[in-house]
Amino acid sequence: VSTAPYGAWQSPID
């Protein structure tokens, strides 16, 4: 979870 706390499921970096 770099920039996306809940979007980590999609892209852990993005």
Swiss-Prot record:
One of its GO terms (biological process) is proteolysis. Optimum temperature is 45 degrees Celsius. It is an enzyme of class 3 (hydrolase). Its EC number is 3.-.-.-. It comes from the Bacteria. Stimulated by DTT. Strongly inhibited by zinc ion, Fe(2+) ion, Cu(2+) ion, mercury ion, N-bromosuccinimide and N-ethylmaleimide. Partially inhibited by cobalt ion. Optimum pH is 8.0. Keywords: Aminopeptidase, Hydrolase, Protease. GO terms for molecular function: aminopeptidase activity. Inactivates puromycin by catalyzing the hydrolysis of the amide linkage between its aminonucleoside and O-methyl-L-tyrosine moieties. May have aminopeptidase activity. Monomer. This is Puromycin-hydrolyzing enzyme.
